[in-house]
């Protein structure tokens, strides 16, 4: 079975402040797009007591196999005793990395969704997002306006949008971009009525 892990686009993004847990309070109008990584999951034999995450494809070389959102999600699930087995996971990367398209967070959510599709709710996704990254929540809500750390609002307008994605091969790490927030103060927060 191949799992599709979709990319996202922020149609607007307001980063208002840094939170105590190191993540950032964001407001974002977003949607998923038809660009995806392909993930396959296989249970390890009992003798193996470690997950193996393999990345392939033209965007795989910059990803650490031991420190990525997939491994973080697996570690959290195992710590909470929600899974006990270990897995071999292969990811064919089609989403450019360090491009703001959420590929890493999408991969992490795809794994979470694979194991607990019917059990994921607002509380679950927010708890895990605090340890993996704020963008994880975008893939739970799929489309809408994410307002602050715990709230999402679905868009009333569900029209199809078309995009031309251009990747200039300039790496922009999310953590590095967000770290610049401390150097300025946003003039104001975005209110729901202004954008929906």
Residue ranges of each PLM-predicted region?
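Alpha-helix C-terminal capping segments
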Residues: 39, 77, 108-119, 155, ...
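DPxDG-like acidic metal-binding loop motif
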Residues: 99-125, 138
């Amino acid at each position: 079975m191949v799992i599709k892990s979709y990319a996202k686009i922020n149609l607007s993004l307001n980063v208002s402040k840094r939170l105590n847990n190191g993540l950032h309070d964001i407001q974002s109008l977003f949607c998923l797009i038809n660009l995806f990584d392909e993930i396959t999951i296989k249970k390890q034999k009992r003798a193996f007591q470690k997950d193996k995450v393999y990345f392939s494809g033209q965007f795989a070389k910059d990803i650490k196999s031991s420190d990525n959102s997939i491994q973080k999600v697996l570690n959290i699930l195992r710590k909470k005793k929600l899974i006990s087995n270990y897995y071999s996971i292969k990811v064919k990367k089609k989403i450019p990395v360090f491009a703001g398209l959420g590929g890493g967070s999408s991969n992490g959510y795809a794994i979470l969704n694979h194991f607990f599709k019917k059990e994921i709710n607002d509380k679950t996704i927010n708890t895990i997002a605090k340890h993996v990254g704020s963008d994880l929540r975008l893939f739970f809500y799929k489309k809408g306006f994410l307002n602050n750390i715990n709230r999402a609002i679905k868009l009333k307008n569900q029209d199809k949008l078309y995009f031309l994605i251009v990747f200039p091969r300039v790496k922009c790490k999310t953590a590095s971009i967000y770290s610049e927030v401390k150097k300025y103060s946003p003039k104001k927060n975005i209110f729901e009525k202004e954008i929906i």
